[in-house]
Amino acid sequence: MKYTQKKPAIVLLEDGTVFHGKAVGKEGSAFGEICFNTGMTGYQEIFTDPSYFGQIMVAATVHIGNYGAFSEENESDGVKIAGLVCRNFSEYGSRPISEESLGAFLERQNLFVVSDVDTRALVSYIRDHGSMNAVLSTEVDNIEGLKAQLKAQPSMKGLALAPEVSTKEAYFVGDENAPYRVAALDLGIKRNILRNLAARGAYIKVFPHTATFEELSAFAPDGFFLSNGPGDPEPLTEAITLTQQVIDSGKPVFGICLGHQLIALSQGVPTYKMRNGHRGINHPVKNLLTGKSEITSQNHGFAVDKELAEKNPNIEITHLHLNDGTVAGIRLKNRPVFSVQYHPEAAPGPHDASYLFDQFIELMTSNK
């Protein structure tokens, strides 16, 4: 396999900083916003999460690929990251349920991987200087040319990427005789979200990002779900309008990550691009309604403006990130609507927040 071959490669950052490594398999160049994930496990779920579309992922954990790949752990129809940077890329994986090596899996997906990088130094650099555009390349003698190409790459701020990963056609998940019907807007939805809803008695119709309120309503849903997804939420004007329409319907609405941001935007509360974002499986969040803390899986580079959310008469902040105090959850005071800026479905990560799916079911029960 070509993923056992290694050629010299570089990680060139937007500010001109260069990190050296070796290309694992694919040659050429790959562009994207570089960021890092601190999770020690769950690489396959991370690579296939549509929320990472357009991003180069730096794995903070040392070993990648050492437990192979298993198709049931894909969170979408394929790899969504633009490239991978790691310290050690394992050619062989060992796990009873593993179907193939990660190298074989990524070779089929044609992903650009650079290994043998000092990821400890790279993660520290991104932490100190913020996420920025970068290029992975085997053109190690063409740095000036790569800099010119990199300069032409658009910033993540202002990019509407959800249309790139949304389904093209509506589809169904679950038992059509289930007690609850949920209309889900796919902005980059993860499969484990759908599994969690279906396991709790929901029959879900997943709609593309172009769906209208009339199309969602024709399904006669008991509630609406607004999914996670990549990019900047503010350019998604049609989705923001649709979000306001489903809120005005009076039916329960549950939003995760990008869906959470759309709910805030629909209420006039802006979002902003974070310096680094939150990407990992051990982020502490405090539930302000119960006083309890939970460890959560997070993946986002934008956040809801806390000061303006606090001033908004329709919004109550329900969760806060304990590391930096950013908004991690809200609910509306006048509607059965709530959302969180993290992933209660995990995949990967802890299950402390799985109660949020139960909360959605309870809201649909009480509003039937």
Residue positions per predicted region:
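Proline-centered loop/turn at the N-terminus of a beta-strand
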Residues: 112, 181, 252-254, 270, ...
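Beta-strand-turn-beta hairpins that frame and shape the catalytic cleft
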Residues: 176-182, 290-293, 332-337
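Active-site-proximal beta-strand elements of phosphoester/diester hydrolases
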Residues: 181-186, 296-297, 338-342
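Residues that mark the start of a beta-strand
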Residues: 179-183, 203, 252, 295, ...
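Cysteine-nucleophile active-site neighborhood
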Residues: 223, 227-306, 349-365
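RNA-binding accessory domains that recognize and position tRNA/RNA substrates
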Residues: 1-214, 218-219, 231-233, 347, ...
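Catalytic beta-strand/loop cores that center a nucleophilic Ser/Cys/Thr
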Residues: 292-335
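A glycine-centered loop/beta-turn motif at secondary-structure junctions
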Residues: 329-367
